[in-house]
Amino acid sequence: MQVSVETTQGLGRRVTITIAADSIETAVKSELVNVAKKVRIDGFRKGKVPMNIVAQRYGASVRQDVLGDLMSRNFIDAIIKEKINPAGAPTYVPGEYKLGEDFTYSVEFEVYPEVELQGLEAIEVEKPIVEVTDADVDGMLDTLRKQQATWKEKDGAVEAEDRVTIDFTGSVDGEEFEGGKASDFVLAMGQGRMIPGFEDGIKGHKAGEEFTIDVTFPEEYHAENLKGKAAKFAINLKKVEERELPELTEEFIKRFGVEDGSVEGLRAEVRKNMERELKSAIRNRVKSQAIEGLVKANDIDVPAALIDSEIDVLRRQAAQRFGGNEKQALELPRELFEEQAKRRVVVGLLLGEVIRTNELKADEERVKGLIEEMASAYEDPKEVIEFYSKNKELMDNMRNVALEEQAVEAVLAKAKVTEKETTFNELMNQQA
């Protein structure tokens, strides 16, 4: 076997391989012997068909199969010998084959980039320092109560967190526009559902009042004909309601899985859940900064084959989320996923190099801890842990998560990490 390697462009490579004629003939004869042992031809017993007849009848197809097999095996031998690491599936380009002569073919493919990590010491990471305070727990309890609240009609003016029922008609330059009219429209104030100024124009009014408010559509509004336009909305305020929050009774508390129904038990459970969320949020915040710094410090070429593969993954995930099938997934425009796919490939290659250079392996104690942390959010953690322990694929996925964490920690060990005190709500709002 003769082998030559050339660079086509960037990460592109072409390997040209020549297989000696005698190697081909030896392989063909060997395969014909195997065929002769199995075939049945009228007039001959199984395994007793003369080789010339076997060759005459099956020689062409056997030779084609043998050439395909030799091309594949010789390519693998060649990349091992030349220490080449292909990325993605190779493309075989057969040459002209002539009986009794050497056979030359080429294989085109991309290789993984050679990554030499740099700039780790210049990466800047700000680690949030946060604790869950009693006030944070109080706020979360208020949120839980609001989620379970009922609405009670009131006579007073509209306030920030009330709910209103309105009829409205919108117009621009005196002309009504499509989608600008509704009857018995229920609007919970303070959720930012409407354009700026709409809710502010309703506050302070009482049920039974009719009035007009002036607003301006944002420049980024989805309807082209309304972008940046001044508009008037005629409002008929039909009903005003205020939240009626449930008391922290034993019955209410037990809805959240607190068996003893005590306020202290609920506060403890809420604090535990908030601290788990906080731990995850801090970890994600630090990780995202470390990875962002790693990507900015290391500009690498990316094999197109890996990007294409990642686009296919993202397409299928998108189709699954919206109830689509395999065919619909492949029809989604690649432009929707190209940037995200490239970034994921870059991050994977860089973290892979961190793992390689630091000789990292998944820490089984960390894997165990991650599973226990994840399981603690379920009603029966022991059942979840047991389910994971018996599922090889899930365990391998969790080992990959642990290994990625270890790689990020290796980056952080060299980065400039500073600490900044913040609050629970500030951090969570940054995550949203």
Curated annotation (Swiss-Prot):
<comment type="similarity">
    <text>Belongs to the FKBP-type PPIase family. Tig subfamily.</text>
</comment>
<keyword id="KW-0143">Chaperone</keyword>
<dbReference type="Pfam" id="PF00254">
    <property type="entry name" value="FKBP_C"/>
</dbReference>
<dbReference type="InterPro" id="IPR008880">
    <property type="entry name" value="Trigger_fac_C"/>
</dbReference>
<dbReference type="InterPro" id="IPR027304">
    <property type="entry name" value="Trigger_fact/SurA_dom_sf"/>
</dbReference>
<dbReference type="InterPro" id="IPR036611">
    <property type="entry name" value="Trigger_fac_ribosome-bd_sf"/>
</dbReference>
<keyword id="KW-0132">Cell division</keyword>
<dbReference type="GO" id="GO:0043022">
    <property type="term" value="F:ribosome binding"/>
</dbReference>
<dbReference type="GO" id="GO:0051301">
    <property type="term" value="P:cell division"/>
</dbReference>
<feature type="domain" description="PPIase FKBP-type">
    <location>
        <begin position="161"/>
        <end position="246"/>
    </location>
</feature>
<dbReference type="GO" id="GO:0044183">
    <property type="term" value="F:protein folding chaperone"/>
</dbReference>
<dbReference type="GO" id="GO:0061077">
    <property type="term" value="P:chaperone-mediated protein folding"/>
</dbReference>
<dbReference type="InterPro" id="IPR037041">
    <property type="entry name" value="Trigger_fac_C_sf"/>
</dbReference>
<protein>
    <recommendedName>
        <fullName>Trigger factor</fullName>
        <ecNumber>5.2.1.8</ecNumber>
    </recommendedName>
</protein>
<dbReference type="GO" id="GO:0005737">
    <property type="term" value="C:cytoplasm"/>
</dbReference>
<dbReference type="Pfam" id="PF05697">
    <property type="entry name" value="Trigger_N"/>
</dbReference>
<dbReference type="InterPro" id="IPR046357">
    <property type="entry name" value="PPIase_dom_sf"/>
</dbReference>
<dbReference type="GO" id="GO:0051083">
    <property type="term" value="P:'de novo' cotranslational protein folding"/>
</dbReference>
<dbReference type="GO" id="GO:0003755">
    <property type="term" value="F:peptidyl-prolyl cis-trans isomerase activity"/>
</dbReference>
<comment type="subunit">
    <text>Homodimer and monomer. In vivo most of the ribosomes are in complex with monomeric TF. Uncomplexed TF, however, is in a monomer-dimer equilibrium with approximately two thirds of TF existing in a dimeric state.</text>
</comment>
<dbReference type="Pfam" id="PF05698">
    <property type="entry name" value="Trigger_C"/>
</dbReference>
<dbReference type="GO" id="GO:0015031">
    <property type="term" value="P:protein transport"/>
</dbReference>
<dbReference type="InterPro" id="IPR005215">
    <property type="entry name" value="Trig_fac"/>
</dbReference>
<keyword id="KW-0413">Isomerase</keyword>
<dbReference type="InterPro" id="IPR001179">
    <property type="entry name" value="PPIase_FKBP_dom"/>
</dbReference>
<keyword id="KW-0697">Rotamase</keyword>
<keyword id="KW-0131">Cell cycle</keyword>
<keyword id="KW-0963">Cytoplasm</keyword>
<dbReference type="InterPro" id="IPR008881">
    <property type="entry name" value="Trigger_fac_ribosome-bd_bac"/>
</dbReference>
<comment type="function">
    <text>Involved in protein export. Acts as a chaperone by maintaining the newly synthesized protein in an open conformation. Functions as a peptidyl-prolyl cis-trans isomerase.</text>
</comment>
<dbReference type="GO" id="GO:0043335">
    <property type="term" value="P:protein unfolding"/>
</dbReference>
